């Protein structure tokens, strides 16, 4: 059995789906922008290294407070169809289909919340989808619980270990991994065939030195500043996808 493992945000599509989903919800529920009163100070604490990424993610998700499970499921379904699918890189979709045709087990492995990572993975025909395990309750609480770690760095490898052969030979023979992020270096080094997508200078330097493929599909924001501007608008519920 061989594997093809894909990151989600800025890998399959040019956006961070965490703020893109927030934008989608806030445009339909404008009063939920009140979450910013909590998230703003929390972001300052995170910048000062006084709050963990995991805790900040819980505060960020406060915009979901009070939603019932049927309401959240309806939002996720609409988000996948209306925002995610149209934004996917055709070049990366082609890679997904190429790996499927080769008979590889497709794994979507993301730090984004599992409740919509699973929906995206199912819609795209992935065999397995893994995200940060945000606990769903009915209704959603102010600060949703996260079961386990933020699914990033080595946590991604731990989260999919049960899918792998009992005896591992590393790098995993015949396996592929796709990511934009230096945070995914453990994942990229885990496989025989790493592929980077619009890597930052640090990751690009490693990719060039290691002779890893670098994919640069067209994207709507040509600079890091433009990407961060889009993220800010999304966090405010003011972003309109081109």
Residue spans for each PLM region:
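C-terminal cap/substrate-recognition subdomain and adjoining C-terminal extension
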Residues: 1, 74, 81-242
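Active-site neighborhood of HAD-like aspartate-dependent phosphohydrolases
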Residues: 1-49
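Amphipathic alpha-helical interaction elements
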Residues: 13, 48, 61-65, 118, ...
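Conserved active-site and cofactor/substrate-binding residues in soluble primary-metabolism enzymes
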Residues: 16, 67, 155
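N-terminal-biased segments
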Residues: 41-58, 138-146, 160
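Low-complexity, charge- and small-residue-enriched intrinsically disordered regions
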Residues: 46-65, 236-242
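Metal-dependent phosphoesterase signature
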Residues: 56-90
């Amino acid at each position: 059995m061989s594997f093809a493992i894909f990151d989600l945000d800025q890998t399959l599509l040019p956006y961070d789906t965490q703020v893109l989903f927030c934008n989608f919800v806030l445009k339909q529920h404008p009063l939920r922008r009140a979450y910013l009163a909590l998230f703003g100070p929390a972001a300052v604490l995170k910048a000062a290294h006084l709050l963990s990424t995991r805790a900040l993610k819980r505060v960020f998700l406060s915009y979901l407070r009070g939603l019932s499970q049927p309401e959240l499921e309806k939002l996720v379904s609409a988000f996948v169809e209306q925002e995610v699918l149209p934004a996917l890189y055709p070049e990366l979709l082609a890679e997904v289909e190429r790996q499927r045709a080769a008979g590889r087990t497709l794994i979507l492995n993301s730090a984004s919340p599992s409740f919509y990572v699973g929906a995206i993975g199912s819609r795209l025909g992935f065999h397995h989808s893994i995200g940060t395990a945000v606990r769903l309750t009915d209704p959603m609480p102010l600060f949703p619980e996260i079961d386990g770690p933020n699914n990033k760095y080595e946590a991604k490898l731990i989260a999919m270990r049960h899918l792998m052969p009992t005896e591992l030979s590393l790098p995993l023979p015949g396996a592929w991994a796709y990511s934009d992020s230096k945070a995914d270096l453990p994942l990229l080094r885990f496989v025989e065939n790493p592929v980077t997508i619009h890597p930052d200078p640090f990751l690009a330097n490693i990719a060039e030195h290691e002779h890893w493929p670098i994919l640069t599909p067209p994207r709507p924001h040509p600079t890091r500043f433009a990407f961060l501007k889009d993220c800010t608008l999304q966090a405010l519920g003011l972003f309109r996808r081109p």
